């Protein structure tokens, strides 16, 4: 399911949606559309897809929690997986992207403590210990087919890649990060339409106030 089909569904249902859900999905779909139009520019596609994800899940939260955005992923994915009666997210994780996910989880360049060590914030042995611990936890989640935990860990890694690009820590179209960028973009292209669709399928759920709500006089 891609932008066009999802947008038709949104137009058909938005009148019965809460304003916050309608705004979230409208914004997310606009960025998904832009990502689909950016074929040939992997960096742009990744950025637009991340914005689409952010538009769908982010809520207006306390400043102290906003600085730990990564901590929000698990509760969001748990809600989606619980609502996913057709196991679409399960299928994506365990059928389509199982190999790619294992590669991503073994990639130190999208593990934030690696860069913290490189920048002198933590000792080298500390990031290595944390990396091994993270991989063991991920392996346990993979072994237990824990879709929520696997998606949460993967999106924390994607978040690090997002930071590298958004904060100017990467060169456009650089070969240095192509492997992880390819894998992350492919995963986002499949996961984001599913999560938008699940949200629209469940307007009765509380999805939270929209981040930066629309103001008529803006």
Please identify what each model-predicted range represents.
Residues 39, 64-67, 172-178:
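Short, surface-exposed loop/turn segments at secondary-structure junctions
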Residues 1-20, 49-141:
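Helix-loop junctions and short alpha-helical segments
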Residues 29, 43-50, 74, 98, ...:
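Non-catalytic, well-ordered alpha-helical scaffold segments
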Residues 4-15, 19, 117-218:
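Polyanionic, low-complexity intrinsically disordered segments
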Residues 30-37, 47-58, 157:
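Short, hydrophobic/amphipathic alpha-helical patches that form generic packing surfaces
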Residues 22-40, 138:
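Short amphipathic alpha-helical segments and their helix-coil junctions
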Residues 39-42, 59, 87, 111, ...:
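Short secondary-structure junctions and interdomain/linker hinges
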